[in-house]
Curated annotation (Swiss-Prot):
This is 3-methylornithine synthase. Pfam families: Radical_SAM. Binds 1 [4Fe-4S] cluster. The cluster is coordinated with 3 cysteines and an exchangeable S-adenosyl-L-methionine. (3R)-3-methyl-D-ornithine binds at residues 112, 146, 169, 235, 277, 298-299. Its EC number is 5.4.99.58. It catalyses: L-lysine = (3R)-3-methyl-D-ornithine. Residues 57-279 form the Radical SAM core domain. It comes from Methanosarcina acetivorans (strain ATCC 35395 / DSM 2834 / JCM 12185 / C2A). [4Fe-4S] cluster binds at residues 71, 75, 78. Disruption phenotype: Cells lacking this gene are unable to translate UAG as pyrrolysine, and do not produce pyrrolysine. InterPro entries: Aldolase_TIM, Elp3/MiaA/NifB-like_rSAM, HydE/PylB-like, Pyrrolys_PylB, rSAM. Belongs to the radical SAM superfamily. PylB family. Pathway: Amino-acid biosynthesis; L-pyrrolysine biosynthesis.
Amino acid sequence: MIKKMATEDLDRFGEKIIEGFQLSDDDLRALLSLESEEELEKLYYVARKVRNHYFGNRVFLNCFIYFSTYCKNQCAFCYYNCKNEINRYRLSREEIKETCKALKGAGFHMIDLTMGEDPYYYEEPDRFVELVQMVKNELGLPIMISPGVMDNATLLKAREKGANFFALYQETYDQELYEKLRVGQSFKGRYNTRRFAKEQGYCIEDGILTGVGNDIESTIKSLRGMKSNDPDMVRVMTFLPQEGTPLERFKENSNLSELKIIAILRLIFPKCLIPASLDLEGIDGMVHRLNAGANIVTSILPSDSKLEGVANYDRDLEERDRDIKSVIKRLEGMGMEPAPQAEFETVLRC
């Protein structure tokens, strides 16, 4: 559908999306099948046009605090699965408080509090709620929580104490693939937890993996599945094999690239937040993701931080170019800039 379009046709296509045009499954198949660089650049062009209509050259910045890498789950793709014999950490309350002090006035729009499904917090969930309240009191910024499949009562308490956003990724809506990835975890339970959070006034984020055994049809199923959540943020991440996991040696020559899917997400979810994560390729990767239609930079770490990300391409590097100053400098070089905080809170509506 995009292959033979000239620039004026691409502009019209972007306008159709802005006016409310919904892509059919056949449209998605055509877009997911694009391969040549010329075709993909056309797709990215339309995605940027749609994004710029709603957000201009302004970008949002999300600080990532992975405060516990302990987890009770056995996700086949995840470095932190409970069977992997790795060094782990759990920040103390005081360490988290000190991290917050270092973040004051840095320019972040939102703080993402992320953990594995750590039994320390799952057995005493009020500990988690108290952390949310402390970070909210320290920084006064919107808070995203990424704690896994928390019980409804704890989600309600966290909401009351200042949490605004709830992130819980389905990874795939292909149930057969899901069972291989999230071993022993309920597909419906995960979906219903996210729906409950939405009903209680949270903004929600959903996400999928690519390059992990998904084909075009399962990717369409996932895109449609995310749509059914009415999400506020949608993401896709490339699967990166992790040492010590069941999928450590998994290799796939997939043409379903993260950048392609980011652009398609922008056409399906024109007003949504779509992340450009630093977790896989750092700031250079951020540039490519923004050029594909993303509008929020995630996995920014506090300056000089030794905290983990999720996939950590830079785990063994001495210098980790993932602080907010480095991000802003590169944004300025792209002709982009951080949005005012008030604009982010208008986008949130939660």
